[in-house]
Amino acid sequence: MNVINNTLNIKKIFKILPHRYPFLLIDRVLNFEKFKYLQAIKNCSINEPYFQGHFSNEPVFPGVLIIESMAQAASILIYKSTGELNINKLYYFVGVDDTRFKKIAIPGDQIFIKVTILKSNKNILIFKNIAVVNNDIICKSKIVFAKKYLF
């Protein structure tokens, strides 16, 4: 069994993801099992720039950024499962399916994200994902990654 009950802090996440502020949307990895699932958190702060315009009187964490948070969590799971962090071999986020937004996230919320590998073959990975705030599901989605060899 490949269960790792260890978190990944932001310094370890920096070594895996190329994203940086304001587009790094994973604050901590709570747990994962290689080739199975990963649990992470995104802390919503009023100081983040998108809250100024989405919406100034009623700030709401943008739904597309919930999807991006899921994609970043899935990217971390791909790396932690395969060990691949190679400029010649990349996994591209290529699709979103069956997405539903159930509730909103607002400043001060902590979004718990769980990504689970639903299907995997040589070049395609499909993830089933949920995002939760205060024990309420705020979003469900499936996302697709494709492996591309650059050389």
UniProtKB/Swiss-Prot annotation:
Keywords: Cytoplasm, Lipid A biosynthesis, Lipid biosynthesis, Lipid metabolism, Lyase. Its main location: cytoplasm. It is found in: Cytoplasm. One of its GO terms (cellular component) is membrane. GO terms for molecular function: (3R)-hydroxyacyl-[acyl-carrier-protein] dehydratase activity. Belongs to the thioester dehydratase family. FabZ subfamily. NCBIfam families: fabZ, PRK00006.1. This is 3-hydroxyacyl-[acyl-carrier-protein] dehydratase FabZ. It comes from Buchnera aphidicola subsp. Acyrthosiphon pisum (strain Tuc7). The lineage of its organism: Bacteria, Pseudomonadati, Pseudomonadota, Gammaproteobacteria, Enterobacterales. The gene is fabZ.
